[in-house]
From Swiss-Prot:
Subcellular compartments: Plastid, Chloroplast thylakoid membrane
Pfam short name (any one): ATP-synt_B
Protein name: ATP synthase subunit b, chloroplastic
Keyword Hydrolase tagged: no
Protein's gene: atpF
């Protein structure tokens, strides 16, 4: 009889059937079933889970590595862009400085050239004025001389007689002889 009870208990806990099955009723399951299921899950799931975790870890590390490489490339490109920007700014300053100095030089050259042209024009104007003044003076002198000679001749014609005329000629001849003896 003791065996019958044990067999009945065994039969109640373990259902003997043709197919394998798990009892999903938590109240009817026992610790052995739970241990088997957990150990099977750990045994078979360990490889799958470790593969999944390893693949995920590799994917994350690859993503991080790629992100770090892109960050380094972006940093290098940023540094190169900063260097090019500084070079461009320096070149722009040099161009601006040389442009300003060239502009000042050309301005000075233009002012100097204009001043030179003004001086030459002023000198030309003054020379023209002097020559015109001299010509006017000479014309006036000629007219005055001509007028004086005409009046003198007129006066002499009216006042001179032959005797006065002869005395004047003798006097001038005497002056010429005196000058001749002084020069010898």
């Amino acid at each position: 009889m003791g065996n019958d009870i044990e067999f009945n208990v065994f039969q109640k806990c373990w259902t003997i059937s043709n197919d394998f099955g798990l009892n999903t009723d938590l109240l009817e399951t026992n610790l052995i079933n739970l241990g088997i299921v957990i150990s099977l899950l750990i045994y078979f799931g360990k490889g799958v889970l470790s593969n999944l975790l390893r693949n995920r870890k590799l994917a994350i590390s690859n993503t991080i590595r790629d992100a770090e490489e892109r960050y380094k490339e972006a940093t290098q490109k940023l540094e190169q862009a900063k260097i090019r920007l500084e070079q461009a700014e320096m070149k722009a300053r040099n161009i601006r400085t040389s442009g300003l100095s060239q502009m000042e030089k050309e301005k000075k050259d233009l002012i100097d050239g204009t001043n030179g042209d003004l001086r030459r024009l002023e000198d030309s104007k003054n020379a023209t004025i002097r020559s015109e003044k001299q010509r006017a003076i000479e014309q006036v002198q000629q007219q005055v001389s001509r007028s004086a000679l005409e009046r003198t001749l007129e006066t002499l014609k009216n006042c001179l007689d032959n005797e006065l005329h002869l005395r004047m000629i003798d006097h001038n001849i005497g002056l010429l002889r005196a000058m001749e003896s002084v020069t010898d």
